[in-house]
Amino acid sequence: MLNFLKKIFNSSKKALRKARTIANKVQNLEAQMALLDDKDFATKTAELKKLFQEGKTLNQLLPEAYALAKEATKRVTGLTPYYVQILGAVILHQGNISEMKTGEGKTLTAIMPAYLNALSGNPVHIVTVNEYLAKREFEGSIGDVFRFLGMTVGLNTKDKDHAQKQQAYLCDILYTTNSELGFDYLRDNMEIEASNLVMKRPYSYAIVDEVDSILIDEARTPLIISQSVKETKNLYKEAQRFVRTLKNRHYLIELETKTIELTEEGITKAENFFQIDNLYNVEHASLLHHVKNALKAAFTMHKDKDYLVDYKDGQVLIIDQFTGRALPGRQFSDGLHQALEAKEGVLIKEETSIGATITYQNFFRLYHKLSGMTGTAKTEEDEFRDIYNMEVIEIPTNVPMIRIDEPDFIFVSLKEKYDALIEEITSRHKKRQPILIGTTTVEVSEIISKKLKKHSIKHEILNAKNHSKEADIIAKAGLKNAVTIATNMAGRGTDIRLGEGVKELGGLAVLGTERHESRRIDNQLRGRAGRQGDPGYSRFFISSEDELAQRFGGTRIEKIISLLQKISDSETKTSSKMVTKFFTKIQKKVESSNFDYRKYLLKYDDILRIQREIIYNQRKEILVSNRVEQIVQDLMQKTLNKAILPHFTNNPTQCQTQTLITFLENKFFPKQTFDLEEVQELCNNPKTNSLDSFQQHLLQKVKXTLQSQKDFFEKDPDKAQYFAKGLKWITLKIIDNYYQRHINDMSSLRQGIGFVSYGQQDSFIEYQKEGQVLFNNMIAKIANDITATILKFSFADSFXTPPKQKVFLNNDSSDDESSKKRRTRKVRTSKKPWN
């Protein structure tokens, strides 16, 4: 293990050393670039693009391109990128993560690698965590830097219409959010008109801002385009009515994993309540699913921590556990959201089925090159390396960091902790020092707010109930007298700049009300203070009654803290490296557990990923092809040849002709397509291979059918193009219908496969095996349906507008206009299941 850690550390140092060599070359060109006129920058860009087309590599162009971008940044924004920002930019170009502390200028850093990679002619996507940041960079001076350099810049947000999205995706540089990128990908892969695709270029390079938030915190969040399904709402209400009758002895909660199950006594109670013999009988699978969701909703999901209730609009809102923001329009998956609605007595919305889905883990792995920036990635470097093949390189700060990080204050009870916290706030507020108070839940933020009001301390509160003015509140958090309470969000993407005279007061004071289960979130909170060499202060206040201590420490930590207080002769606050290490150990344990779980889920998701890429690849070929008639003909020929094989099993020179004709006319062809005597002659001729002869006969039937349909359209020149469009429409609609069913079948399989472990079988192997069977069956049904539909029925006037799809994130619906937008992705896999 020690050797492994040394190897990682040395590789990081080596990467930084190489980056310094390159950065020095960039710096050496500074004087040369300063001599350029403003009009020369676009000309230089054209020259660099030409050099790339003539064979120069991006690595060879890097020094000049970075120097040019650096000078352009200086002229447009008035800010000159620091040497350390050039280092960060080199790391980004190499497809790695630049860990840059708060205030070190990640925004300027991204300009250089984005510009360089756009010289290749392929698009560069700069991904932000919210639309505010994407719009800010696109509309502001950062976007102007690219325009000054002769690059086109686009913005991709929910409010953009279809034409605007298409135009944005054609730009050299695209500012976008992660969710909009993913939804455009899914929408494009449900499109039936090639002209409607919004993404017609390859996924070449992405720079992900706050990369840990998107690729770690939201890694498990599935992007889903979904449709409503018919589902009785009474089951949710009945299941909720049942769980309200339960006592502690009826269920078991595992605090570490937050899972809940009925005990034997609880199962018996359920069977009596619902008047059934066996709750786990397959016929009661739906009831069991509803009961489990009701249990989770009642005992593991907490209002104002996991979700909010908007009684005015009658809805349950998810709280993002990593940002503290409410997520309007989203739903918890698998019926859990409906269970919460039943619990809170608001209108129960329809449950949904999945039309298309992808996780951020798999979506961002579609890029040829991926890089990212954040101030807090080192604690997750194993995951970035294992899942995304990216190294985390710590970039030195421009000036030394002088923030004072004090040891945690520890307490036995919450009351003692809150009293000490208010005392600290009051003391610092009297000096007019700005204070940022970090909480982990909305509930705690409101408790602190009430206590501050009692002490007549004016403050701002920033949580899921009040985030509309987030940027404005955070921007003012560094002024004298400012007291700001922030829930898990401390305004990432917006710097807290110190007001006049604040440095003399010690800078911004950051006070954490408890440890988060992730060290990264704690580090993000600390990182709000001490930017760019400013003074700052941070300390956490923790108690044995904190959730983290309760889940993992139990009474043990309470006894330790009580003992320490006696030893230190303090009735309340004390500090201890041992207790701090204990909490850090818990955090590492949780982080490791979460990483293992994400890897575990990714293993399952990879099965669906392979299947999705096969389907989307074939679908894309059909959608954009100008030879769809040949593709369909090949598919039909292959399908029919396979279908008739059982009729020639015993003897390839003969078969039961009437049985064969009946089979083909029932399944694929119109009645009276085949002449009995002709088929008898083909199938029972001892001088020829009957199977080969009949397969050629079938091919002629297919060609004749397609030609007659084509002739029908070509009678009218205005309708000539409808034949190919009709073939595409039928083929794509059948693929989509079956694939959407398949996704839901795979989801059901995933939910139910856990039970096989009881039979001493590996659940993943079973999922893989059963998933392959489902996929193969789907492929066969698609091929059969396409063949039968085209051969049996006329499709001359079968064009119809496809239904609107609803967009879902975390299985959450969103009825806004963004559901109309589309986009595509070139999938690397080239497997073709039908031809």
UniProtKB/Swiss-Prot annotation:
CDD domains (UniProt xref): DEXDc_SecA, SF2_C_secA
Compartment(s) of residence: Cell membrane; Cytoplasm
Coiled coil recorded as keyword: no
Residues bound to ATP: 85, 103-107, 495
Biased composition (Basic residues): 820-835
PROSITE patterns named in the record: SECA, SECA_MOTOR_DEAD
NCBIfam families for this protein: PRK09200.1, secA
UniProt function note: Part of the Sec protein translocase complex. Interacts with the SecYEG preprotein conducting channel. Has a central role in coupling the hydrolysis of ATP to the transfer of proteins into and across the cell membrane, serving as an ATP-driven molecular motor driving the stepwise translocation of polypeptide chains across the membrane.
Protein name: Protein translocase subunit SecA
Provenance organism: Onion yellows phytoplasma (strain OY-M)
Gene expressing this chain: secA
